[in-house]
Structures are given as C-alpha cells and as structure tokens.
Amino acid sequence: MSFIAIIPSRYASTRLPGKPLADIAGKPMVVHVMAQAQASGAERVIVATDHPDVQHAVLQAGGEVCMTRADHNSGTERLAEVVELCGFADDDIIVNVQGDEPLIPPQIIRQVAENLARCDAGMATLAVPIHDAAEAFNPNAVKVVRDSQGYALYFSRAAIPWDRERFAVSQSQIGQTFLRHIGIYAYRAGFIRRYVNWAPSQLEQIEMLEQLRVLWYGEKIHVDVALQAPGTGVDTPEDLDCVRAILASQGQN
C-alpha cells in the first residue's frame, strides 16, 4: 500500500520560537520527525514549511521540502497547499505527521494510512486508552467516542462519555471506556481539497478542535486504537528537555 507523509513545520511558535530547528541529539527536531516518517515505509516524505532555515536543514539531511505560504491558519491548510503544488491524485493517501513529534513510532504512521485504505471514510486517525482519572478530566487531553464500527461520534476536551453512576459516587476512578485522541491523520487528497473549502463550524470554535469540522459537515472519521502509544511531543521547553533526556538514555547524544 502506497502513501505520502507530509510534515507541516511552522517556524513561529509562541512557547518555543524556532521549534523545528531545536537541537535534539545533534540534529534539528524536524529531521528526527522526518526520519521516523521515512522509517514508516511512506512512498514520499515531504516537509512543508514557510521558513528558509527549515528548508535548508531538511535539504542538508537529504530530505524533500515544499515551501508554503506563511499565512495558513492550520496544518491542514498547509497540507492542502502541498497537495495542490505536488498535483496529487484525489485517491492518494496523505498522512499528516505533526512536526513536533520526534518520537512518533513509525508503526503508527503506517497504521493510520492502512486504516484509511480499509474504510470508506475520508479521514482516519488514532487513539489510545486512558487509564488515569486526571487525564480523563484534563482539557488538554482530547477525548473521542466511537460507534460500533469505529467511526468517531464526537471529540471533546470534556470527559466523554460521562459515567453517570460511577461519577455520582467519585471522580477519582474511571472505567475502561475512555480514549485519548492522537493528533495524527490520514486523508485522501480529494478529501483535503473539499475540506479547506468548508467554513469553520460552531463546534470546532467552541472546543478549538479542527477535526469537529469534518463531523459537522456530515463526513466520517475512522478511529483505530494505536498499536503503540506515541512518545512525548514538544510544545514547551520542558517537553524539549524531556525528549533530549529520553534520546540520551537511548545512547543518542
């Protein structure tokens, strides 16, 4: 099965300026992400960026880069520009790999692509079980509920589904029904072309979750349970230190 991995890599970051070029074990973070995507077996791995320094780092590492505009509101919009610039066919499977996930397992990059190829949804993603009550009630951990076929019913920052009987007694323990959404997506290129023409939905603006636009317009998202949990993503300087420590413990200094 053939698929293309695209890594949106925005240079500007409020909490961590120049994040794609942050040094991790002697290499820029974006190069680590690119290597993980290449190990997934993707036919092509393309870094989409708006900054010449990121372009230079990717080319220096032997990667493929596509320069995009700087005014995109989301990674999906940047993805759509790459789809048009590269002229991908509507049936081509595109995996959106977050540019701040240097520890993402190659296995799950391939898994989400294979998941999309097997179903009739325009979009597929992954989730992992939640076992900790604090995570279930953390608004930064996005929860998802699915139907009997694995299609998303809703994504929320709230604790869903609400276990009425259990939580009436205590909210310190949760059952086995919670899933945390992982921010990796697979789409067919034709779906991306349609998606960027849809106006933002009320629900996505309330929850600040872009994927809710898909459900709002009546499209399906298939959600599989990830074969492997993703590693630490990099949003803050503390996250960056954590990733550096993990790789150092693995002998990458």
UniProtKB/Swiss-Prot annotation:
Q: Might you give the EC number(s) for this enzyme?
A: 2.7.7.38
Which UniProt keyword terms apply here?
A: Cytoplasm, Lipopolysaccharide biosynthesis, Nucleotidyltransferase, Transferase
**To which pathway does this protein belong?**
Nucleotide-sugar biosynthesis; CMP-3-deoxy-D-manno-octulosonate biosynthesis; CMP-3-deoxy-D-manno-octulosonate from 3-deoxy-D-manno-octulosonate and CTP: step 1/1; Bacterial outer membrane biogenesis; lipopolysaccharide biosynthesis
The cross-references to InterPro entries, in alphabetical order and at most eight, read:
Cytidylyl_trans, KdsB, Nucleotide-diphossugar_trans
Instruction: Report the subcellular localization.
Output: Cytoplasm
Q: Name one GO biological process term.
A: lipopolysaccharide biosynthetic process
Instruction: Specify the enzyme's EC class, one word.
Output: transferase
Q: Name one GO molecular function term.
A: 3-deoxy-manno-octulosonate cytidylyltransferase activity
- Which ranges does the record mark as transmembrane? none
Known catalytic reactions:
3-deoxy-alpha-D-manno-oct-2-ulosonate + CTP = CMP-3-deoxy-beta-D-manno-octulosonate + diphosphate
Naming one, the record's GO cellular component terms include: cytosol
In the UniProt record, does the keyword Ribonucleoprotein occur? no
Family designation:
Belongs to the KdsB family.
PANTHER family to which the protein is assigned, alphabetical: 3-DEOXY-MANNO-OCTULOSONATE CYTIDYLYLTRANSFERASE, 3-DEOXY-MANNO-OCTULOSONATE CYTIDYLYLTRANSFERASE, MITOCHONDRIAL
What function is annotated for this protein?
Answer: Activates KDO (a required 8-carbon sugar) for incorporation into bacterial lipopolysaccharide in Gram-negative bacteria.
Q: What is the designated name of this protein?
A: 3-deoxy-manno-octulosonate cytidylyltransferase
